[in-house]
Amino acid sequence: MQEKVYIMRSVIIKSFSLVFLGILTFSNQLMAQKNDLKFWLDENKGTYFQVIFLNQTWLRFNESNSGTKVNGVPESSTFDIGLRRTRIQMFGQIAPKAFMYFQFGENNFNAVYSNNGNRKIAPFFHDALCEYKLSNGNQLKIGGGLTIANGLSRFSQPSIGTIMTMDVPVFAQATVEKIDQFARKLSLYARGQVSKLDYRFVVSDPFPVSTLGGSAEPISDNSSFSAQKRNKQFQTYLSWQFFEKEGHTTPYMTGTYLGKKKVLNVAAGMIFQKDAMWRTVNSADTLFENLNLFCVESFLDLPLNKEKKNAIMAYAGYFITDYGKNYLRYNGLMNPADGSNAQNVITGAGPAYGNSYPMFGTGKVIYSQFGYLFRNNLLGEDLGTLQPYASVTVGNYERLQGNISDVYNVGVNWLLNGHNAKISFDFQSRPSFLLENNDVIKGGRKSCFIVQFQASI
């Protein structure tokens, strides 16, 4: 086993070295890019159409959960290469008060990816919406279509190209790939900015769980998403902006402005859907339960020195997540494994192999992150600067019987050209859980190390 780990580490080091040579060469070309791919539609530059390309490539070493198998072979650890996100965004102000937005792409493509046995990527439209401005400014916009616009949290509708941490706190995308399409829903919304208030109200038509592409979860004594009733979902998000107003072009919310804006917000959000969940009572009668999600949060992006262009970034959020009795869901981002032979895992909560952990559940969650942006060109004019960060997620879920799902991340972004060209290094420590005589107990902690290269234009 030790020899295997040594060989794997040697392969990882050599792989990282080769990739960095390519990254540095390509990043120099990106750093020379000054203009957006933006096309003006009139002489007065009042209307436009813009295209953005983005790719996030991961190199990852993961310490596997107990019993993990890859292609039928037990693996105590894995090293994989994958495309976390590959996206094309197309949007524009096509008339003085008319806006349209499309996003096309794919996610989580690695060597164990399979679409019904087919490794070929299945890209799809993430967003397709039309929006009309009823005011002269941003006071009121009405939109509809397939959209990320929703309630709960800024991280429920994140701009993935501006993330500070390696990835977003996915638990905030509370129904992802259950009754939505990768966190997007068919919705009608109103959003706007009135004085210092940024608001959005959303009515969504959730997808039925039967269209997930696989078999639906069987009903049990623990709550799961209902395969029968499908009521409309109501969402609200309200944010009070103490300093500068945040960008309002699309419904997405920025991860970090890298000190280019002075932002301090306090916000609250909610999602409600009647009878979204179901379970059995005494293994016989069916009981429907409401989906109730609530969050209060604060976001800070504060420049410190105009000449140095250094800044601090911070976020803190408190979530109350009620999916019904004992709801729990494991999830692992771009899971490097595809099976398990473990016998003592929590059942009925999704795949517990690879890098997964209890990410969603009925209970309460505290999430916080903090980062510091060093001065501009810290490493030299052509090598950019650094942005170290740390984040913590503490989930107290009902089904874990008092055990805490605590996840810690520390990392650093090497900003070669802001968000357009950056290399991120991230270390994660996550919990594992076992089931003994129907009692949930904590297993050993597992770790993961990721290098990501993000390029966008």
Residue positions per predicted region:
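Extracytoplasmic loops and strand-loop junctions of Gram-negative outer membrane beta-barrel proteins
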Residues: 35, 69-73, 169-174, 218-221, ...
